[in-house]
A protein has these predicted regions:
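Active-site neighborhood of HAD-like aspartate-dependent phosphohydrolases
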Residues: 1-46, 140
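Short catalytic/ligand-binding loop motif for oxyanion handling, primarily in non-cytosolic enzymes
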Residues: 13-16, 21, 72, 76, ...
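Substrate-recognition element of Asp-dependent hydrolases with the DxDx(T/V) motif
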Residues: 52-92, 99
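General small-molecule cofactor/ligand-binding pocket signal
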Residues: 77, 109-111, 146
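Substrate-recognition "cap/lid" segment bordering the active-site pocket of phosphatases
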Residues: 81-125, 132-136
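Acidic, Mg2+-coordinating phosphoryl-transfer loop and its flanking beta/alpha structural elements
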Residues: 126-159
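Basic, glycine-rich
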Residues: 155-173
Length: 173
């Protein structure tokens, strides 16, 4: 069975907005340099991942993924990562709870780290992710990757195109 994997942070959970609410500025602000970011303060927020807001179009993305699951026979899984060195000890549970509260029909699997996601890929599996390196490594092992950028609609359109093409192929069989 093929699988469609949805990343969480940056795809359905708005990590950037959640962190901005906590630290008082946006990490994507061009005037902020990463070495200046108070990572210790971010890591110390004990419920950061659990209380992240949804991305504005998260429900649309999830519903499209559900359509792929239901109509095309894919398995649907959240594939997320824990912070490196597991220095945010509650991230694992927070992410599980976040998904259960919002999308209880979708199981959560962990990379465990971001660069490990490709190990879950079987040729033809789909990954929807916001990190270009994850998308590239996914493609290198035979998967199909849809990258979410600031133009979220482009990712939705690309996933819809994949759905339509596969529907057309199935109709020929």
């Amino acid at each position: 069975m093929r699988t469609i994997y949805l990343d969480m942070d940056g795809v359905v959970a708005d990590w950037t907005e959640g962190v901005a609410e906590f630290i008082g500025y946006r990490l994507d602000d061009p005037t902020i340099k990463y070495p200046d970011v108070d990572w210790q303060k971010i890591r110390s927020h004990m419920r950061l991942f659990r209380h992240l807001p949804k991305m504005p179009q998260a429900d649309e993305m999830v519903n499209l993924a559900r359509k792929i699951r239901d109509d095309l026979g894919y398995e649907l899984i959240f594939l997320t990562a824990i912070p490196h060195y597991n220095d945010v000890h509650w991230a694992f549970w927070d992410k599980m709870l976040w998904a259960q509260e919002r999308y209880p029909d979708i199981p959560v699997h962990f990379g465990p780290y971001s660069e490990d996601k490709k190990k879950h890929c079987i040729a033809g599996d789909i990954l929807v992710d916001d990190r270009p390196d994850n998308c590239q490594s996914w493609k290198e092992v035979g998967g199909v990757a849809v990258r979410v950028t600031k133009d979220y609609q482009a990712a939705l359109d690309e996933l819809e195109d994949l759905y339509q093409r596969e529907q057309m192929l199935l109709s020929l069989i």
